[in-house]
Amino acid sequence: MTTNSVTSGRRGEPLVLRDLSKRFGAREVLRNTQLRVEPGQFIAIVGRSGCGKSTLLRLVAGLETASAGSITVNDKLLTGLSDDTRIMFQDARLLPWKRIIDNVALGLPKDRRAEALKVLDQVGLADRANDWPARLSGGQRQRVSLARALVHKPRLLLLDEPLGALDALTRIEMHRLIEDLWRASGFTALLVTHDVQEAVALADRVILIEDGRIALDETVSLARPRSQGDAAFAALEKRILDRVLQKPAAPERESFTHPNDGEPRWPGVPAHGVRWAV
């Protein structure tokens, strides 16, 4: 296996953030953020609650508007939602009144329904196509959410703590599934996670956000597939975790908070958009 993803020839989109800032009221959550992501790279974003991780992801998704700076996707200025971008959240957000196949096919023309079944097969749930969401486990629901995103063949996949509510064994299974599908499809991926081990397991680069700025950009030069029991893996995980913990926790704030990341929310700012897996 190669040490990192081969970005040349991948169908993922390049992403560039220039002087990106975001304010909620008087609080600046992101400030002058600079980031370049090559096509097909897998980027993990870590940091303490409230540091700006999920806000950055929502800006890239087009669910929030930047206070300053710009986002360029595939050399085009981002001005809103994109058909080439999909986002997954910790909550699978399946429609309980629709069967699994219909959740995956949501937004597809009728003549592409067969594609939904094919993607369900890729995530190991073809035999549950006609079940209701309530009959699935948490891990299975997230597999459906992943299938619903991938059926649209995104060039940029955003993952906002999608595995945070799953048990340890299910998380490991999902790591393997996400990595396999990423390697097969070649999309660019941005993962927000509190789990440094998860970041090292999946990413080409681990980005630490601290006080609204990128404080660390660590290349993960470990061969794939990665073993969490490997000494080099453990050493890199410890180094990044030590750096995350080096910064004392921020004092509590009096404000509305974002449910995913503890980031400030304010009246009139939409909490979600329509492109979460549609």
Curated annotation (Swiss-Prot):
Residues 251-278 are annotated as: Disordered. Its main location: membrane. Residues 15-236 form the ABC transporter domain. It is found in: Cell inner membrane. GO terms for cellular component: plasma membrane. The keyword ATP-binding applies. Keywords: ATP-binding, Cell inner membrane, Cell membrane, Membrane, Nucleotide-binding, Translocase, Transport. Pfam families: ABC_tran. Residues 251-264 have a biased composition (Basic and acidic residues). InterPro entries: AAA+_ATPase, ABC_transporter-like_ATP-bd, ABC_transporter-like_CS, ABC_transporter_ATP-bind, P-loop_NTPase. The keyword Translocase applies. The complex is composed of two ATP-binding proteins (SsuB), two transmembrane proteins (SsuC) and a solute-binding protein (SsuA). Belongs to the ABC transporter superfamily. Aliphatic sulfonates importer (TC 3.A.1.17.2) family. This is Aliphatic sulfonates import ATP-binding protein SsuB.
